[in-house]
UniProtKB/Swiss-Prot annotation:
InterPro entries: LS (IPR034964), LS/RS (IPR002180), LS/RS_sf (IPR036467)
Originating organism: Renibacterium salmoninarum (strain ATCC 33209 / DSM 20767 / JCM 11484 / NBRC 15589 / NCIMB 2235)
Protein residues bound to 5-amino-6-(D-ribitylamino)uracil: W26, S58, F59, E60, V80, V81, I82, F113
Catalytic activity from the UniProt record: (2S)-2-hydroxy-3-oxobutyl phosphate + 5-amino-6-(D-ribitylamino)uracil = 6,7-dimethyl-8-(1-D-ribityl)lumazine + phosphate + 2 H2O + H(+)
Name the UniProt record assigns to this protein: 6,7-dimethyl-8-ribityllumazine synthase
Length: 159
């Protein structure tokens, strides 16, 4: 699992920061886990009701982030792309990653990178922050929580 070496995040006090979470719709079960983790991280940092915006897929995350970033202190982009048998995976991953990076650098607003780019469904489930259930041991990582914490910590640093 790639989470080895991750820093221990400090307890954040982001009360008063404006946060928007942009979530793609593909891979509903994984997306629900990512969104739950993002909302938990926001609450843990003192943000009770961040704005949530849904977009069709991960390819649409950058345009939504570009439009919304100027009005917020931090943006979190959540999506899932799972490799298939065509080059589509590489195109979407590259476009979304480059687009989100450009938004953050151009606007100066931190964009939490919660885009899972996985080779298979199991990798996505392992990173989705899902609780244990019958037949499922639970996720090993919570990338929605991590992306939100990173965006908020960076926003506080830049204040």
């Amino acid at each position: 699992m790639s989470g080895a070496g991750a820093p221990v995040s400090p307890q954040l006090n982001a009360k008063g920061l404006e946060l928007v979470i942009i979530a793609a719709s593909w891979h509903e079960k994984v997306m629900n886990g990512l969104l739950d983790g993002a909302l938990r991280a926001a609450r843990d940092a003192g943000i009770e009701e961040p704005r949530i915006v849904r977009v069709p897929g991960s390819f649409e995350l950058p345009v939504a982030a570009a439009r919304l970033a100027p009005d917020y202190d931090a943006v979190v982009a959540l999506g899932v792309v799972i490799r298939g048998g065509t080059p589509h995976f590489e195109y979407v991953c590259q476009a979304a990653t480059s687009g989100l990076t450009e938004v953050s650098v151009r606007t100066g607003v931190p964009v939490g990178f919660g885009l899972l780019t996985c080779d298979n469904d199991q990798q996505a489930l392992d990173r989705a922050g899902l609780p244990a259930a019958p037949g499922f041991a639970g996720s090993k990582e919570d990338k929605g929580y991590e992306a939100t914490s990173a965006a908020l910590e960076t926003a506080l640093t830049l204040r």
